[in-house]
Amino acid sequence: MLEIKYVRENIEEVKQALAKRAGKADFEGFARAEKKRRELLQQIEELRHQRNTVSDEIARMKRNKEDAGTSILEMRTVSDEIKTLDKTLAEQDDFIQQFMMAIPNMPHPDVPMGASDADNTLEKKVGTPRSFDFPIKAHWDIGEDLGILDFPRAAKITGARFSLYLGSGAKLERALINFMLDLHTNEHGYTETLPPFIVNRESLLGTGQLPKFEEDLFKIEGQEYYLIPTSEVPMTNIYRDEVLNEENLPIKFTAYTPCFRSEAGSYGKDTRGLIRQHQFNKVELVKYTTPETSYQELESLLANAETVLKRLGLPYQVVTLCSGDLGFSATRTYDIEVWMPGQDKYREISSCSNCEAFQARRANIKFRRAGQKKLEFVHTLNGSGLAVGRTVAAILENFQQPDGSVVIPEVLRPYMGGKETITNETR
């Protein structure tokens, strides 16, 4: 959430920033509510002053044993008027709060302007895509031919956009999870967490999925609980409504969790394979930082995610998202896109974002500098380190062999009992 004082004083700048995101908001309604709120506050203040004056007059009359009935009636009338105005004020405050919760973060000044992913800026390419001298297959065909992925039976068990891993497929997924967690905890200094996979409404409000994106979530019927769309949500809410000490920052968390997304609006997109699933595994990275170090920490977060791909030997590129492609809570985002030869394109495998104080303001996460009484909002950052299913897909496509087998990246072999190649396991 943006600071309301900033929005009040810079309304045109906020309008322009929202326009760069191709977003819409009821700024006229906000202005009316703000005007009405100021009028109500003035009226309430005047009535309270009147009530206090009458109260003092009643006390004086009682001391002098005078009849205070008329004054008492006047005070009750004034009190009733105050209650009515307080109710109207609460309605205006609620409208303003809902307006503020629906406004996305402001793009960083360095973010390129644009309307869609076609306007994103390429930062770098790492690794050279492999040349194949045999027909390339997509990962869904490779996995099914090897007997390690079974999409038809997953659909039978649940429905579309679910996957069933078998044998070495399941081991490869688990190996990647363990490798990523070991890398981020042992080398990158993150603290491993195992958070709940179900969160309450307040948690999703804090990170920005609610109220605007409820249709993208899986809600538990009859409860104010939701399945997590990413472990960014529980990890960012660990310190909700708390005050941290500057000396403990940055705080760096990582977690493996399944993630659940309804993929509303994705009909017809990536209907095959592991790219767009209702349930998928992800290793997530979250940081709490001071404002002055958050962009340095963003570069570090990006490097941490890149290291996974470098160790696996997968070619990738990094792009900066344009204003129209930014996520709701982010002010700047890097996407890492891995090369998928079976699809002849780069596909997103990680998003690394700085949300500055946007989430911290919504979740009320503050810190205190040494020797200072004033509290400040932390900056929060998050990034995938990495999306596990998409990494499996990239391994299958990049390391496929002419005989249909797949070479296991060397760094994963200790996690797979020394196995070097996945061969046909069809049952």
Swiss-Prot record:
Catalytic activity: tRNA(Ser) + L-serine + ATP = L-seryl-tRNA(Ser) + AMP + diphosphate + H(+); tRNA(Sec) + L-serine + ATP = L-seryl-tRNA(Sec) + AMP + diphosphate + H(+)
SUPFAM superfamilies: Class II aaRS and biotin synthetases (SSF55681), tRNA-binding arm (SSF46589)
EC number: 6.1.1.11
One Gene Ontology biological process: seryl-tRNA aminoacylation
Primary subcellular site in the record, as a coarse category: cytoplasm
Localization terms from the record: Cytoplasm
CDD domains on file: SerRS_core (cd00770)
Signal sequence, renumbered to the chain: none
Pathway this chain belongs to: Aminoacyl-tRNA biosynthesis; selenocysteinyl-tRNA(Sec) biosynthesis; L-seryl-tRNA(Sec) from L-serine and tRNA(Sec): step 1/1
Enzyme type, top EC level: ligase
Binding-site residues for L-serine, renumbered to this chain: 230-232, 284, 384
Binding site for ATP: 261-263, 348-351
Keywords: Aminoacyl-tRNA synthetase, ATP-binding, Cytoplasm, Ligase, Nucleotide-binding, Protein biosynthesis
Quaternary structure and partners: Homodimer. The tRNA molecule binds across the dimer.
Family: Belongs to the class-II aminoacyl-tRNA synthetase family. Type-1 seryl-tRNA synthetase subfamily.
Physiological role: Catalyzes the attachment of serine to tRNA(Ser). Is also able to aminoacylate tRNA(Sec) with serine, to form the misacylated tRNA L-seryl-tRNA(Sec), which will be further converted into selenocysteinyl-tRNA(Sec).
Domain notes from UniProt: Consists of two distinct domains, a catalytic core and a N-terminal extension that is involved in tRNA binding.
Protein name per UniProt: Serine--tRNA ligase
